């Protein structure tokens, strides 16, 4: 009797059980009975593991056998007792599947031990048990060692051997990886072979590998197959192979694209069953099981010549690339997609690891078990080390695909095999870490420390100021000198891969940090994964997939939104997949849902060999060596030197036509044998001790193998050698880029090749081969010497170091004049070069974001009506009956002084809210506050939604205009301006939350070409700039806009990626200018200005020379002019919306991009600065302070805000506009700070963004005072310069006067005179003694002495000089002025304190003088009255007759009472805040 059950693939745990009388007899014939339960696999006549079966033979289809398609799971329990007749098997499923109990009847139990093997599909088995009485015992799963939420229970710590073995077990028996590999292979149509012993694994993998090599070696055949599938063709076949499965997948893809109206494919799919499809199944197959169709037979390919590059169509290239990608999937499935092997507890981890190494070729073939290893086996292993087979097998690791997670997984396993005794021997000496643990820990540099432990690296102590792994990696040392060269090189390769993975870790954290998921780089992966699930899963589910999170889109996305959503999905899958690498000791059903989800997700990441290629490209992002050149770059010159070197033994000669696999092997064997002979001769030489010792183990053998592999035809479907073809391709690309001019070396490096868009041409040339980047990686690895990882770290350090000029330009201490000089030199030429670089480097789709990144909400003309022209609608003469109430009367009124003046006043009121006038006066004078007064007691305004309050003012103004009789009449007449006001009102009501209002000063247009007037304007501009004054404009041109921040930042990231290529060149400073040139061109072409501006010439507007000549109509207008379609009122609704956007973009897009780039680019170029601010605001206490009265009032009163956003981040045009605004500067800067907050929140600094938004109103009020102080400081600086100049002139004149005086009195030096008949008498000074100094030194000393004495002695000019120098410095170095403003009251009190002694002395002197005169007068009169005659002069030395006196012993009258105050500093408030005065 037979029972069978079927459940959907991937969800059922137990699907089918076949038991019958015949089966019972069949099982009883085995010495160890095995009951096997398959999900979709029927029993075959399979032997036990490692039984004597013929290797390589696959089971033939039989009436009771068909291919397994799902995930399989094995649980084994050995019972050393008699199996009873009522044996029961209990299975429990996960959420969503059923639990079943199956009864097994086995007549006549046996007395010996039995093994019960349970194979399940679709997921882990939380509990599986069997018993014959009572509660069935629990059986742990292999996933039971996972923990959730990063908590490790207080239990005994496992030993080093146990930890190492557990890590290896998790890599080899990764259920999620095996399941994902199987499912992906099934989706792509790869053949599935059920292997029954480990000896079949290398044979199976080598068969797939051989088919791939055969296909790659014949690119003409691949293109013939690809071209045939461009049209609809296909046929049936009776044979099954990897190459045919590739063709089948292409056929399926074509069939799904050519479906009939009913949705059925025109070509039978391999997942269908029908008369055209042969199915390897019988009637015993359960219904609903997914089965495979036999693929079509390959068509005979006629012999033809290889196609040239021009003859290959892009469609055919992409199909060839798909074919090659399918081979990679099938290879990975042949290597790891065998649950019957990797999940079988019969095999140890040692056996599984050696089987994988044998399949790749790292281990010698057909080697015995580890535990039975003898001297002969050890000798075989030693002989295999460094052999041609092992070296070519090492290259095969990098041919598994461009997925760095796949490569890293295999590299880690091979490192474990090569150093097995150190990791898993009887006495292991170092820890072993799984690949997922290394990748998950790379974000905080811990992964490199773990890798150093595995590979015996020593990076040394971290130097002061160094915080990155690559800054110490360039000088790291190898501790183990006995390590095999191949082992060392695989470690270096793994470190390079880990470098690429680490570079995206911060991006992943920033991407998920935008949604406030709570991820942190220093937190363990399991905790980060649990945080993400807890905060993003819908329905409060503890674990979910990306599609079930709030991050998944719920509507159709735009193209740029799709890229952003894909980036978020990758970040979610990677960070949550890292959780599977956190090993702990929590077991049971609580941790199982989390660990299973994380294992499954990580398995999908590793199982796709063609995914995440952009991460693997990052391993090449920092190589600044020359790649493209006229003939050969630095990398190819290094290759040529190696090829011509005598130690290469000529194996690289005559390889231009491409090598076959057998040729590679023969050349590599010849190289190994010749080097071995050379070393032996060298050692036997009599001069061996005098010469440099050559190691017996060749450190350059892998390099030779890589060069031979790259000279084959197995890369990029090239008919000749890859390296020779690639050299030709680079030469052609160089000529296309240079176009006859000298292209800088930095733009021809490998780094530039990968970052500036050249790689996309390389991919197309390479027929979209998935291994294209792998070939570049191997080439760079081979020409990087004996330590490629150290070289990579040194290059990374050199490239990442900020230029000195950039540090100077962004420094607070740099004078403004120096910044201008550094920027102005050759500015226009550098901007054009930057534009050319961006134009050839950026994806053309990026340019569309120039106009789509901004959604204009309100129109300039609408704002002109309610702001500049508001006075026209202030008083309305109408009948009183038309106004029923005061509210209606007020609704017709607009702000008489303009709207922005009202918003400025509102911001000022917020900044001074709750502060009495007496307190403000006391603070301004630095006096003490009243008793009991504190900052915490002053009320603060409610600015939670300050932008909504400001936006409501604009709405009120629009409504007032539309209610005004003129506005109503204009709207009824469909006046374009009235329609713009109405459209702006409607859009602002719908998008009020994200709208930002900004203003620009309309440029004055000077049409006169009179030379005198132009000279007068230039002279006026010079004096205004000298005084830091501007031609003030009462009103600006205002508009409302909503910024698509994600699209803007995505564009800026791509721009910055291009900019980093030229980071060490001066061009780096002009990338923003180059982008602005591109913006001008795109806006001019998109907006069609000629439609709305009569006489507008697009060509002359885009041409700088024509703009100078005044040909363009744009020079005769400014942003305040009406620029709208002449028939705007009659346009359809959709066209009117488009015209609204185009007319605004024509005027404002350029200015908006300047402002946005000023905020975003410094964040990308110098992220440490804003990360420091983010850290300051990230604490819970700092967040609470944002609404704390004490903190807010200290912030308002101290005026100690940072002005980086104004000085170092605002663009030049915005600064000029802001300084020229007579009204509206506070409003503009307040909204600009809101924009800066949005930028920082989107870029992963949410706390800083929140702080900027909450304090924006105070910033706006402060910036007005800041600009006033800057104007005053310039005037003080001018006075200081004049003072110092006069002092210097005075000293110079005194020196000249002294010299002239000496000459007049005969003190001149002696001279020697000579009489000449032609010239007459000539006299020269005569030396009377040996000179002890130079004349210049004497003159300088005299000048300084005279100046110093003149300043100190007679006039006390030294303090004047110090004050003058201070005024000049604070005028040019803005941080000094900021410091003075912040400590203004402290300086006032300090000045009073310093002046008090002099003031008191002068007061005492005055009082003494008055007392002396008064006493003398009284004495004189008294004496005169007594003697009746004028008194005689008294003796000044005998004061006894002076009478009574009120003077003290020193002759000084007593002092009046003076009230003293004590200066105390209160609790620290905002940085650099002024102290308070308390009595």
Curated annotation (Swiss-Prot):
This is Rhoptry neck protein 2. Residues 1-24 form the signal peptide. Residues 1297-1333 are annotated as: Interaction with AMA1. Component of the moving junction (MJ) complex, composed of AMA1, a transmembrane protein on the parasite surface, and a complex of the rhoptry neck proteins RON2, RON4, RON5 and RON8 localized to the cytoplasmic face of the host plasma membrane. Interacts (via C-terminus) with AMA1 (via ectodomain); RON2 serves as the receptor for AMA1 on the host plasma membrane. AMA1 and the RON proteins are initially in distinct compartments within the parasite, namely the micronemes and the rhoptries, and interaction happens only upon initiation of invasion when the micronemes and rhoptries discharge. Changing residue 1297 to A: Impairs interaction with AMA1. Disulfide bonds join 1313-1323. The chain crosses the membrane at residues 1278-1298. Essential rhoptry neck protein that plays an important role in host cell invasion. Upon host invasion by tachyzoites, the protein is injected into the host cell where it functions as a receptor for apical membrane antigen 1 (AMA1) on the parasite. Part of the moving junction (MJ) complex, a ringlike structure formed between the plasma membranes of the apical tip of the parasite and the target host cell. During invasion, the MJ migrates from the anterior to the posterior of the parasite, leading to internalization of the parasite into a parasitophorous vacuole (PV). Residues 25-1277 are cytoplasmic. Coiled coil: none annotated. GO terms for cellular component: cytoplasm; extracellular region; host cell plasma membrane; membrane. Its main location: secreted. It is a single-pass type I membrane protein. It is found in: Secreted; Cytoplasm; Host cell membrane. Keywords: Cytoplasm, Disulfide bond, Host cell membrane, Host membrane, Membrane, Secreted, Signal, Tachyzoite, Transmembrane, Transmembrane helix. Residues 1299-1479 are extracellular. It comes from the Eukaryota. It comes from Toxoplasma gondii (strain ATCC 50611 / Me49). Belongs to the apicomplexan parasites RON2 family. Residues 49-68, 291-316, 1419-1445 are annotated as: Disordered.
């Amino acid at each position: 009797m037979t029972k069978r059950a079927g459940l959907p693939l991937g969800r059922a745990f137990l699907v089918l059980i076949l038991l019958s009388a015949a089966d019972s007899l069949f099982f009883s014939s085995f010495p160890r009975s095995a009951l096997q339960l398959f999900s979709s696999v029927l029993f075959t006549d399979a032997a036990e593991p490692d039984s004597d079966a013929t290797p390589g033979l696959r089971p033939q289809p039989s009436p009771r056998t068909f291919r397994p398609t799902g995930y399989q799971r094995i649980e084994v329990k050995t019972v050393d007792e008699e199996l009873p007749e009522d044996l029961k098997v209990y299975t429990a499923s996960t959420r969503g599947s059923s639990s079943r109990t199956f009864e097994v009847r086995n007549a006549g139990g046996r007395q010996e031990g039995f093994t019960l093997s349970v194979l399940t599909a679709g997921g882990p088995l939380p509990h599986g048990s069997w018993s014959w009485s009572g509660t069935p015992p629990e059986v742990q799963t292999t996933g039971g060692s996972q923990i959730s939420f990063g908590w490790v229970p207080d239990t005994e710590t496992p030993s080093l051997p146990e930890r190492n073995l557990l890590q290896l077990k998790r890599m080899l028996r990764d259920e999620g990886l095996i399941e994902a590999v199987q499912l992906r292979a099934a989706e792509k149509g790869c053949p599935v072979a059920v292997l029954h012993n480990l000896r079949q694994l290398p044979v199976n993998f080598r068969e797939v590998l051989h088919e791939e090599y055969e296909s790659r070696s014949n690119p003409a055949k691949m293109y013939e197959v690809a071209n045939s599938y461009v049209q609809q063709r296909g046929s049936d076949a009776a044979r099954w192979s990897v190459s045919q499965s590739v063709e089948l997948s292409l056929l399926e893809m074509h069939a799904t694209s050519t479906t009939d109206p009913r949705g059925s494919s025109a070509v039978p799919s391999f997942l269908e069953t029908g008369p055209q499809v042969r199915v390897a199944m019988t009637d015993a197959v359960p219904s609903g099981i997914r089965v495979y169709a036999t693929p079509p037979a390959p068509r005979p390919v006629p012999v033809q010549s290889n196609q040239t590059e021009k003859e290959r169509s892009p469609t055919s290239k992409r199909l060839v690339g798909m074919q090659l990608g399918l081979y990679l999937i099938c290879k990975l499935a042949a290597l790891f997609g065998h649950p019957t092997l990797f999940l079988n507890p019969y095999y140890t981890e040692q056996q599984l690891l050696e089987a994988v190494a044998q399949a790749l070729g790292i281990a010698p073939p057909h080697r015995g078990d580890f535990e039975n290893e003898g001297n002969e086996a050890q000798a075989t292993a030693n002989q295999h080390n460094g052999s041609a087979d092992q070296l070519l097998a090492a290259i095969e690791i990098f041919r598994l695909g461009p997925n760095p997670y796949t490569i890293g997984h295999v590299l880690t396993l091979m490192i474990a095999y090569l150093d097995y005794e150190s990791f898993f021997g009887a006495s292991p000496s170092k820890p072993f870490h799984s690949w997922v643990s290394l990748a998950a820990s790379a974000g905080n540099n811990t992964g490199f420390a773990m890798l150093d432990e595995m590979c015996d690296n020593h990076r040394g102590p971290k130097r002061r100021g160094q915080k990155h792994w690559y800054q110490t990696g360039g000088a790291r040392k190898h501790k183990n000198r006995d390590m095999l060269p191949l082992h060392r090189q695989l470690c270096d390769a793994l470190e390079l891969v880990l470098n690429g993975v680490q570079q995206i870790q911060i991006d992943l954290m920033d991407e998920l940090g935008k949604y406030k998921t709570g991820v942190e780089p220093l937190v363990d992966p399991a905790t980060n994964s649990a945080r993400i699930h807890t905060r993003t899963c819908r329905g409060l589910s503890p674990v979910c997939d990306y599609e079930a999170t709030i991050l998944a889109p719920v509507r159709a996305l735009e193209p740029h939104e799709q890229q952003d959503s894909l980036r978020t999905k990758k970040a979610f899958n990677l960070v949550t997949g890292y959780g599977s690498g956190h090993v702990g000791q929590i077991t049971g059903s609580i941790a199982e849902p989390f660990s299973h989800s994380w294992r499954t997700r990580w398995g999908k990441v590793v199982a796709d060999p063609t995914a995440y290629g952009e991460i693997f490209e990052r391993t090449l992002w920092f190589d600044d060596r020359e790649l493209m050149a006229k003939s050969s770059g630095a990398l190819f010159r290094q290759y040529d030197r190696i090829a011509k070197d005598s130690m290469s033994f000529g194996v690289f000669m005559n390889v231009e036509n491409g090598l076959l696999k057998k040729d590679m092997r023969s050349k590599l064997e010849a190289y190994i044998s010749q080097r071995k002979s050379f070393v032996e001769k060298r050692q036997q030489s009599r001069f061996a001790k005098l010469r440099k010792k050559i190691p017996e183990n060749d450190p350059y053998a892998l390099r030779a193998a890589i060069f031979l592999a790259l000279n084959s035809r197995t890369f990029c479907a090239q008919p000749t050698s890859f390296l020779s073809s690639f050299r030709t391709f680079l030469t052609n690309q160089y000529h296309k880029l240079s176009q006859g001019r000298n292209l800088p070396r930095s733009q021809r490096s490998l780094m530039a090749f990968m970052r500036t868009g050249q790689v996309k041409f390389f991919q197309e040339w390479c027929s979209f081969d998935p291994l294209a980047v792998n070939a570049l990686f191997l080439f760079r690895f081979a020409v990087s010497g004996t330590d490629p990882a150290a070289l990579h770290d040194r290059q990374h350090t050199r490239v990442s170091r900020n230029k000195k000029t950039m540090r100077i330009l962004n420094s607070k201490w740099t004078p403004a004049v120096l910044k201008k000089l550094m920027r102005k030199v050759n500015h226009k030429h550098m901007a054009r070069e930057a534009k050319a670089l961006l134009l050839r480097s950026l994806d053309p789709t990026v340019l569309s974001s120039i106009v789509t990144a901004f959604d204009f909400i309100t129109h300039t003309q609408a704002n002109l009506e309610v702001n500049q022209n508001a006075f026209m609608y202030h008083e309305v003469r109408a009948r009183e009956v038309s106004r029923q109430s005061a509210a209606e009367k007020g609704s017709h009124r607009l702000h008489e002084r303009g709207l922005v003046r009202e918003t400025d006043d509102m911001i000022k009121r917020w900044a001074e809210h709750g502060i009495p006038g007496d307190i403000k006066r006391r603070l301004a004078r630095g006096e003490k506050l009243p008793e009991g007064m504190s900052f915490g007691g002053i009320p603060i305004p409610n600015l939670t939604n300050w932008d909504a309050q400001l936006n409501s003012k604009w709405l009120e103004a629009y409504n007032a205009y539309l209610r005004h009789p003129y506005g109503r009449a204009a709207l009824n007449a469909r006046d374009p301006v009235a329609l713009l006001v109405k459209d702006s009102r409607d859009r602002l009501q719908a998008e009020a939350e994200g709208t930002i209002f900004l203003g620009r000063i309309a440029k004055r247009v000077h049409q006169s070409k009179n030379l005198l007037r132009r000279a007068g304007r230039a002279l006026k501009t010079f004096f205004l700039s000298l005084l830091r004054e501007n031609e003030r404009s009462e009103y600006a041109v205002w508009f409302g806009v909503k910024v698509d921040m994600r699209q803007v930042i995505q564009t800026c990231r791509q721009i910055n990626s291009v900019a980093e290529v030229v980071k060490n060149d001066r061009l780096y400073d002009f990338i923003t200018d180059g982008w602005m040139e591109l913006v001008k061109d795109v806006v001019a072409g998109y907006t069609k200005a000629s439609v709305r501006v009569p006489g507008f010439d697009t060509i002359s507007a885009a041409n700088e020379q024509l703009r100078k000549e005044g040909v363009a109509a744009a020079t005769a207008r400014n942003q305040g002019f009406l620029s709208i379609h002449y028939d705007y009122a009659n346009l359809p609704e959709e066209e009117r919306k488009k015209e609204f956007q185009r007319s605004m973009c024509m005027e404002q897009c350029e200015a908006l991009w300047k402002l946005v780039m000023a905020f975003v680019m410094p964040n990308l170029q110098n992220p440490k600065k804003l990360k420091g601010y983010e850290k300051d605001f990230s604490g819970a206490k700092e967040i609470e302070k944002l609404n704390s009265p004490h903190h807010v009032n200290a912030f308002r009163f101290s005026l100690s805000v940072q002005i980086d956003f104004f000085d170092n981040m605002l663009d030049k045009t915005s600064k000029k506009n802001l300084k020229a605004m007579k009204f509206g500067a506070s409003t503009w800067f307040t909204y600009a700070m809101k924009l800066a907050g949005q930028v920082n929140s989107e870029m992963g600094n949410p706390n800083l963004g929140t702080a900027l938004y909450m304090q924006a109103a105070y910033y706006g009020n402060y910036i007005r005072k800041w600009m006033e102080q800057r104007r005053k400081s310039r005037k003080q600086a001018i006075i200081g310069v004049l003072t110092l100049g006069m002092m210097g002139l005075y000293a110079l004149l005194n020196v000249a006067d002294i010299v002239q005086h000496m000459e007049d009195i005969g003190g001149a030096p002696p001279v020697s005179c000579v009489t000449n008949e032609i010239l007459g008498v000539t006299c020269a000074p005569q030396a009377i003694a040996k000179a002890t100094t130079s004349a210049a030194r004497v003159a300088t000393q005299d000048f300084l002495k005279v100046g110093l004495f003149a300043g100190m002695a007679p006039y006390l000019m030294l303090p004047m000089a110090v004050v003058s120098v201070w005024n000049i410095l604070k005028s040019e170095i803005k941080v000094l002025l900021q410091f003075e403003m912040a400590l203004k009251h402290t300086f006032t009190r300090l000045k009073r304190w310093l002046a008090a002694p002099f003031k008191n002395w002068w007061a005492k002197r005055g009082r003494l003088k008055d007392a002396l005169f008064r006493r003398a007068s009284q004495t004189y009169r008294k004496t005169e009255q007594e003697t009746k005659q004028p008194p005689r002069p008294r003796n000044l030395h005998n004061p006894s007759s002076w009478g009574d006196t009120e003077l003290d012993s020193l002759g000084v009258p007593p002092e009046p009472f003076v009230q003293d105050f004590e200066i105390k500093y209160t609790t620290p408030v905002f940085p650099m805040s002024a102290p308070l005065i308390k009595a």
